[in-house]
């Protein structure tokens, strides 16, 4: 489906130069984000989390919203778009159960444009995606209309080379960029390392549009998963759109609040207890500037701290 013949490959190697005015005046189609704002058209996204933090559940739910043209955690799809979900970790029965849970909370709707490539369903698995064989295998599975490819996950799909070496990542990066030029957005699902960052070479971050990190939080309800989502890279969107979120999942149903709202409540309580902003900063591990910003927001919103008076310490 995506392969080019040798003649066109030779033509593509010739440089194509544009003048500034020519590019500015070029009539390009309007942008159609797959999920606004973090899952762009013709982009690359990295989603990483430690084991048990819900990264596959999250990726599947986001992909389902793309396929149906719906929404997920307040992020809206522009229109329905085809999806190829490539899973190289889960046994086929577990994959089936997760998809059943996903569709059960969506009136059992199974969109025809949501395609699955399961390693467990292949005779010889899925070839490593740093090889021509692996690239060709996945490209042959991409059907017309597919605009989102989900690779879940990098550790099981990328098996050659050294994870921490930038050079080992280069062939895969070149392939992802080639898919991008052909109108395919890729969501790469990966594991977090001990530090909380994505595991392996930082070169993976160079060309991606968005990096999302899911962190599992303590929950009093064993049937409820509580996650903090952070955008550590957010090309093209800022401010409130890039704010951290506190996400909960229970029985396949997702809900969320902005993490800043929870932080405000914590800061408010500390202020009530008479703590100074510098003390709160040290206690929470946030910068003084961030704590000051939250205090200013509460002051503007006329949040009462001490009786009817808003408490602001005298520290500069």
Locate the predicted segments by residue:
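C-terminal regions of RecA-like/P-loop NTPase motor modules
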Residues: 4-9, 143, 181, 220-316
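Phosphate-binding/switch region of NTP-binding enzymes
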Residues: 46-47, 52, 57, 148, ...
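Conserved inter-motif catalytic segment of the P-loop NTP-binding fold
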Residues: 35, 51, 78-162, 257-261
